[in-house]
A protein has these predicted regions:
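Expand to "…catalyze enediolate/carbanion chemistry for C-C bond making/breaking, isomerization
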Residues: 1-134
Length: 134
């Protein structure tokens, strides 16, 4: 089939959605202008970089970051644009929180964090083992 259905391939461009990455506080300050660009369907927040842009890298509970996210949500909803977010911590409650706020594009944690978190949990369970237990 490869190479024989060019019309089908060409027409798929109608289904492509353009999502921009928002990783700096200045992008949120200019979000209306960014989302007004023809062809942009939504945006995606990178929380590490966004928090870093305000000098609070990784501080996801910072008040200034919370205000930026509320502004992001308000503008995105007003402009009827899809919202995305990278939920770093592998916690289903944080995932549901974003879904309930209207986020429809979500990255859930990342491989090294997931593996490391689970490994640390399991190692705590086995820290009392002796050689006789193995």
């Amino acid at each position: 089939e490869y190479g024989f259905n060019f019309d089908k391939y060409y027409n798929q461009q109608k289904n492509i959605k353009l999502i921009v990455q928002i990783e700096h506080f200045e992008a949120i300050e200019n979000l209306e202008e960014i989302l007004a660009i023809d062809g942009i369907h939504g945006s995606f927040i990178g929380p590490y970089d966004l928090s870093g842009s305000i000098g609070k890298a990784g501080d996801f509970n910072n008040e200034k970051l919370t205000k930026l996210l509320k502004k992001y949500e308000k503008i995105s909803k007003k402009m009827n644009k899809s919202m995305g977010f990278h939920v770093i911590e592998p916690n289903h409650k944080l995932l549901l929180e974003k879904i309930n706020k209207g986020y429809s594009i979500i990255a859930f944690s990342f491989d090294a964090y997931l593996l490391g978190t689970k490994l640390n949990e399991e190692l705590k369970n086995y820290s009392d083992f002796s050689k006789n237990d193995i």
